[in-house]
Amino acid sequence: AIKLNIPWSDLGSWKEILLMFNKNKRKYFKKKNIFYRPWGSYTNLYNGNNFLIKELNVKPKGILSLQKHFHRSEHWVVIQGKPKITLNKKFFTRQPYETIFIPKGAIHRIQNPNKKTVKIMEAQLGSILKETDIVRYKDIYGRAN
């Protein structure tokens, strides 16, 4: 049980509290936080002031676009798998719990050459954190600009 150190009158009634909780719960669960792409999926976990936390799941043989962003940088932490990462014409392979920083304007891509899903936590930082802030140079799914 939770013990509150404030008088009941400061809380209002249980009915009002439950109505507020249910209203917010419905509002939250109406949002579609999981987005499916040809390469796998991503989940928006937390959206703050000028930052967004995502979980990327790149399916086996999945390849994201070779892309850049004008208004944000990204910091990736590999959670599962061994992705091949392109960053400004250099190639890296990362192990679980290793990181890589993608500066604003850098051309980058994630590839999963493996037989198991790659999972990456992505922190986006910037003034515009929308999917429209993207220039695609190469994309095996036909989405290049």
Residue ranges of each PLM-predicted region?
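Noncatalytic linker/hinge segments flanking ATPase motor cores
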Residues: 94-99, 125, 141-145
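C-terminal structural segments of small proteins and small subunits
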Residues: 121-130
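Acidic/histidine-enriched, glycine/proline-rich intrinsically disordered or flexible terminal extensions
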Residues: 131-145
